[in-house]
Structure formats: C-alpha cells, structure tokens
Amino acid sequence: MAFLSLFLCLVFSSPLMAMPPALQGRKAISPASILKGPSTDNGARDFHGRKFPHFMMQLYQNIISRRDKDLSNLEHPTLQESDTVQSFIAKSYTTKGNHWTLFFDMSSISTSNELKSAELRICLPSFGKSHSVTVEIYHTKDDKEKLFMGSFKTKISSALDADCKVFNLTMVLHNYLTKGKRLIKDEYIQAKGLLLRDLEKSATETGAERVDIVKQDKHHVSDFSAERIILVVFAKEKDHAKPDPPSLGKKLFPSKYGMADSANKVNGFRRLRRNKKEKTRMDVGTTPPKPVEEIKPKCRKVDMFVDFQKIGWGSWIVYPKAYNAYRCESACAVPLNETDDATNYSYIKSLLPLSDTDRRECPSCVPVKMRSMSMLYYENEDFVLRHHEEMIVEECGYKDI
C-alpha cells in the first residue's frame, strides 16, 4: 500500500467525492484509440516521438478486456503465470545470402525474474518464393560488445494470411541467463567454426550492414526494417525471503531502496509482503474505558482520482493515463503510521497533494481488499507491460488495533 499512499499525497487537497474538474474536461484515452493512432510504415506506433510495438498494445487491450475471465483464454497462456512482459525492438540486423543476423540490447532482463517464455516476432513483407534461412541472435550494448546467443533454421514463405512469424526462443534465453556468455560463445565457435570478428569482417566487406531485403530478392517488399523485428519476454518475479519495497517506488527512487547501481532498471512485478511492526499498547490501567454505547463512524470507500500527467509521469506511462484508486474515509483523529505498510497503494497516496485531513486515515478504517492494475510504459528504450499489485481499493473496513 506504500505506492498508492505516496501517489495520493500529490494530487488532491480536499475530500474526493467526485471527479476533479481538471479531469472532467479531459478526453478519455483508450488502448483502442492508441492503436488507431499514427504509425510508421513498418508497423511501430508513436507515443511522444517514441516507438512501441503494435503487438504490445494489442496484448494490453486483450488483458484489460478480459480482466474477469480466465487468462488461459488469451492468445498467450504464459500470461497466466507471468507478471511482466518486456519487448525489445531490434537495434539492427544484417543479411548475407540465407543468413540473417539480429542484434538486441537485452541488458534490462533481470536474473531476479524467472523466465517463463521468450518469442521472436518477425513481421515480414510478402515473399515471391520460399527461402530457407539461418537466423542468428546476438546481444549487444551500445555496439561495444556483441554476444552470440544462439541460432535456428527456418523456411520463410509467402506471408499473405499473417504478416508476422513467431519463433520460440525460450531455451536460447534460458541458456544465456543461466550459463553466461562464455559458455554460449564457446558453443557458437564449436558449432559454426566462425569467430564473431570473421562474421563482422565479411559483413563489412559485402556492405551487408542494414541491407534491405529487396536487394536479396526482387520480389521482396522494400519497407522491411529492424523495427519489424521484436523479441518478447514473459517473466515472473521470484519469491524473496525479505519483503520488497513498492515496485513503482523502486523504479523512481532506486537509491532510496538500495538500488543505486541499477537506477534505470525495474526488476519486475513485486508481490509485496507486509512487514507489520508490533504496536505498543498503553497499560490497561492508564487507558480510559470506552463507553459501552459508543458507535463507530461509518467506514466508507470514496473516490481518489490519479492523473499521471499531473504528477510528472505522463511522458513514460502510455496507459492508463488516469485512474480511480479510491481511499477509505472515516472520522478519526489518529493518523495511520505510514511505515506499517509498504505497498504500491500507499506509495501512490503519498504522491498526491492531499490535505492533512484527507491524507490521514483512521487506524481502524483501512482497505481490507485491494486489486492489481496492469500498466503499459517505457523502461529506458524498452516497452513493458507490467502487472502491479495492490493499486486500487476494492473494500474498506475496520481493523482491530
């Protein structure tokens, strides 16, 4: 609840019983409207001048439209056991005859996540004839280091019904994450008998860098580009022995949570565990007895609208742009100790500009049922669909203190 509490502190300065005027005049933005928005010739969509795969928005729209249904009905059954979906647009590619070499920057893949599935999606133009090709996958960071990860052979044929081919790369990424680059590189040398520098030399000599497919076959469509090549990774946060801080809090303030060396990384979804502190009680002899006829004020759920643009997150959050997180309200004079819970909800609430009265919650009138929310946003240059726990209050109730 820490994330939502921090979020609530930034937005409102009065009790929230209705949608704020600032949001009433805003045009609603839906995933469908983004899908219909401007796109490049290669199928990538634009958001604030940044491109993201059309497939990721479709996947997000699928999830929110079937929120109350079994996820196994979705296109990807692995969504049922994943809480993070990362997409990586190819940095570049080369072609030489029937060899394709694809380069991705996979630096943001975290070993603290459990890999569930990985797939390569190549959205091809229509071909006039079939081609048998060998596809090689490399990891590269700023073109300073190129690490061979694996290869496979496939037959590329005319793609009139579906313009995207999907290849299962789960084992390739699993070997990379668990065995390390040394073992992978050795396997490449033994299997191919060709060093990376030899491959690069031959590509340079033939001018193959960023070669358009049209030069290889006159029937190929000339608009094929690296942005049509996407690596999609499905993962799940591993269980940890210690409670974790809110997932969104770790993204924005890594140094605060001891993550200074990985400030630009988000290590997947956090299943937040409460770290309840022992509450010190007053001696029974010094506590005045409560009147028997005392009636507790009503504990109710009221609106608390969150606008990501207003708190400075609009440039990297694609969807949702705003949502109703709700909060619990009851008459009381003792504030809830914000260190008692560390959740996404409490973090969000602490970001909103609530008045002291609105920010304060009765220790006994608290959220008793929360639900998660899927979010679509950028992590550096990568496009991520992530499922954050405890983002929205569903029910309020009294809790003994």
Curated annotation (Swiss-Prot):
Disulphides: C299-C365, C328-C396
Gene3D superfamilies named in the record: 2.60.120.970, Cystine-knot cytokines (2.10.90.10)
Alphabetically ordered keywords of this record: Cleavage on pair of basic residues, Developmental protein, Disulfide bond, Gastrulation, Glycoprotein, Growth factor, Secreted, Signal
Tissue: Expressed in the dorsal marginal region of late blastula, becoming restricted to the Spemann organizer at the early gastrula stage.
Propeptide: 19-274
SUPFAM superfamilies from the UniProt entry: Cystine-knot cytokines (SSF57501)
InterPro entries in UniProt: Cystine-knot_cytokine, TGF-b_C, TGF-b_propeptide, TGF-beta-rel
Subcellular location: Secreted
GO cellular component annotations of the record: extracellular region
SMART domains linked: TGFB
Entry's Gene Ontology BP terms: gastrulation
Glycosylation positions in this chain: N168, N337, N344
Signal peptide: 1-18
Record remark: domains: The propeptide region is both necessary and sufficient for bmp-inhibitory activity. The propeptide region and the N- and C-terminal thirds of the mature protein are necessary for neural induction activity. Although cleavage doesn't appear essential for activity, residues surrounding the cleavage site are necessary for activity.
Family: Belongs to the TGF-beta family.
Assembly mode: Monomer. The propeptide region interacts with bmp4 in a non-covalent manner.
Role of this protein: Exhibits mesoderm-dorsalizing activity and neural-inducing activity, but lacks mesoderm-inducing activity. Regulates the expression of specific mesodermal and neural genes. Induces convergent extension movements at the embryonic midline by activating the fgf signaling pathway to induce t/bra expression in the organizer region. Acts with wnt11 to induce Spemann organizer cells and induce axis formation. The unprocessed protein antagonizes bmp-signaling.
Protein name, entry field: Nodal homolog 3-C
Biological classification of the source: Eukaryota, Metazoa, Chordata, Craniata, Vertebrata
Gene (name only): nodal3-C
